[in-house]
From Swiss-Prot:
Classification via InterPro entries: Rbsml_uS13_C (IPR027437), Ribosomal_uS13 (IPR001892), Ribosomal_uS13-like_H2TH (IPR010979), Ribosomal_uS13_CS (IPR018269)
Protein name: Small ribosomal subunit protein uS13m
Main location: mitochondrion
Gene3D superfamilies listed in its UniProt record: 1.10.8.50, 30s ribosomal protein s13, domain 2 (4.10.910.10)
Annotated segments matching region Disordered: 92-116
Function: Located at the top of the head of the small subunit, it contacts several helices of the 18S rRNA.
GO BP of this protein: translation
Length: 116
């Protein structure tokens, strides 16, 4: 089992499938990444050389927004909404649904867990 950009990948997994498990990389970006590096479509993670793995990590760090950057950006957006007292920011603080979902019967358990 190896880790690439913080995502765990199994040795018998195809490269395109393993790369989609990284946050910020979907199926299309995984295919583009594979083509740019010249990696075959059916090659598995355990068949990659150390050099190819380093190339994958380097290309992901260079071109794509990865896990920790996405999480940091999301958190900053939520903090900004809270600081300017937007409705969505207040709902985030309360732990209530943001997008108009029903709260009388649904989302009760989420509200109970936050109140404790």
């Amino acid at each position: 089992m190896s880790y690439i950009s913080g995502a765990r990948s199994l040795p018998d997994e195809q490269v395109r499938i393993a790369s989609t498990k990284m946050d910020g990389i979907g199926p299309k970006k995984a295919i583009q990444l594979r083509y740019r590096l010249g990696i075959s479509g059916n090659i598995k993670m355990n068949e990659l050389t150390k050099y190819q793995i380093d190339q994958i990590e380097q290309m992901i760090a260079q071109d794509h927004v990865v896990h920790w950057e996405l999480k940091r950006g999301e958190r900053a957006d939520i903090e900004r909404l809270i600081s300017i007292s937007r409705y969505r920011g207040i709902r985030h603080q309360d732990g209530s649904p943001l997008r108009g979902q029903r709260t009388h019967t649904n989302a009760r358990t989420a509200r109970k867990q936050i109140r404790k």
